[in-house]
Amino acid sequence: MNMNNMTGRPSIDRPWMKYYPEVLRNLQIPACTLMEYLKMNCPGENVIAMHYYGNDIKWSTVFEKTEIIARALKALGFGEGDQIPVFLQAVPELVYVLLAAEKIGASLLCRDNTLEENVEAVRKSGAEVIIAHDYLAQNELEKYLSDSSVKKVVLLDPCYSCNREDMPDYIQNTLDSRYPEVKAGGSAVLGWDEFLAQGEKFDGEAEAQTNVDRPLFRAYTSGSTGPSKQVIHSAHTMIGVVHQMNFYAGTDDFRPSWMIACLPPALIAVTVSGILMPLASNKLLILNPFCDPMDIDLEMMRYRPNSFVMIPWFVENIMHNGRIADDYDMSYLLAAGVGCEAYNNKQLENAQEFLKAHNCNARFTTGYGSSEAGSNMTLPLSPHPMGNGNVGIPTLCNVISVFKPGTQEELTYHQMGEICVSGPGLMLGYDTPEATAEALQTHEDGMVWLHTGDLGYMDEDGVLYVQTRGKSPRHGGGDLATLPMENRLADAEIEGINDEFFVVVPDDEHRGCFLPYLFVILKDGYTVDDIEDEVRDCLDDYMQPVEIVELSERPFFHFKTNRIGLTQEILSARNTWRKNRRTVKRAVAV
């Protein structure tokens, strides 16, 4: 783009398009079903679509199983517009059930939270049947039967599509740990073979009228930044995400492998970008759902995938488990990067150095997306160096810009504001119209924009820099944007700090304000006293942490840095201190 013709509004200028080849710039999203889309991109029915613990599954099997399961779902009473609660990990049957739900006009409902939250989701769905793994406990089954309309539960053995003996011992151990003392049983339970048999017998019409815009996939946000909400996607919106990435496809000469490990399909990014995208782009999909996150290094070395879905927790384990030899060759890894949460400059430097030390020349990148946007919103295609929140440029059909928080007023380049996106992957909405209206807003340009709640800015080349989640003002002035604060410390290269991150908690003495706490992971032989002066010297006054706390390692919960848990600990300790202080004051008064 000619810089002289720029308006100063990213949504109009779209400067990022210069990084895409001319042939891709008019990319159109197909208006078709997921099944039609996968068949359109299928390299051949005899080609292996998925590998699952020693079992190679051909595309022909995917199509055949989908047909049988669609009829089985109809036999159980599911039909057009119904919600099918599914509590499966990323096993082959998850793919079949998703495609079968589409065929009968229903939608999958996935949730991976507490039992109470899962039961609540099922109750709201009105479903009388749920699908789960056979490690469902009897007390869990009874909870579904008593607190929702569920009458039947279809149970699947995780090894139905593989031989258990083909799993490494540590995978078997992880799988075994999921089984309770008393498994679900009784008249309400239907085994997988019994379920399939019902499909074989069903002789009615299974296929609903095609509607690519009806709900197909429902999942819940993680709740890491607020109350968990149900996000609803259609075949059209999911294809809207996948189609913007699948031009990185396999060829007749080289077919890359892609591993998805540990992560549950109840995370929209896992189902859309982690499973559907590789299937639609001629990659060999390696399903590895029962790998413990602490064993991700072993599975990486066993499968040697060309790429796999990484999150910061996995990278930490790979670097620090101590099982990867100094001379181990990781050159098979052709792409490497993380999503899921912000990644500061110190983390980025550590990861890039680790790759380089192990003969991997891939540039370690950070991505950006959300459940509401269908997962990936950006790609790391610009030559700009990674770091400082750089998450790349908008994907081909997405328009991303920055707006004054709480408004629809678009800001110009390098101005901090709320990140908003408009594109074909946006959710249909939440399960409540009020929340949907707040998140999806039609602007004066006639486009529907998702207001993400994230803060950041865009430069003149269209590179997006994500800085923090929401505003966190400190009493007396200054906004506690966590990533820039962490990067300030990372760039200072303070001797003794291996990793560091901030947790921002409510200031109970000043309503609407917040206080920062700094957590550090130190090198051997160092203490907080050794680094505190340098830490405070490089931070502005409003950034000064209330306390610097040493941890042995970065804590994770539900695949993200456990800021929620640490916040609860801080608030609990603060309340205990105040309670003790009041007790002392009363004693002194007496």
Tell me what each language-model feature is.
Residues 1-76, 80, 160-161, 166-184, ...:
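N-lobe entry segment of adenylate-forming
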Residues 52-56, 69-114, 258-264:
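Conserved AMP-binding/adenylate-forming
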Residues 58-60, 207, 216-243:
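Conserved AMP-binding A3 loop
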Residues 105, 239-258, 266-309, 320-323:
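Conserved AMP-binding/adenylation subdomain of ANL enzymes
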Residues 122, 130-135, 423, 428, ...:
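AMP-binding/adenylate-forming catalytic core of the ANL superfamily
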Residues 184-190, 194, 306-309, 322-387, ...:
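Gly/Ser/Thr-rich phosphate-binding loop
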Residues 393-397, 409-441, 478-480, 526:
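Conserved ATP/PPi-binding loop(s) of AMP-dependent carboxylate-activating enzymes
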Residues 501-506, 517-521, 531-590:
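Conserved C-terminal "lid"/linker of ANL adenylate-forming enzymes
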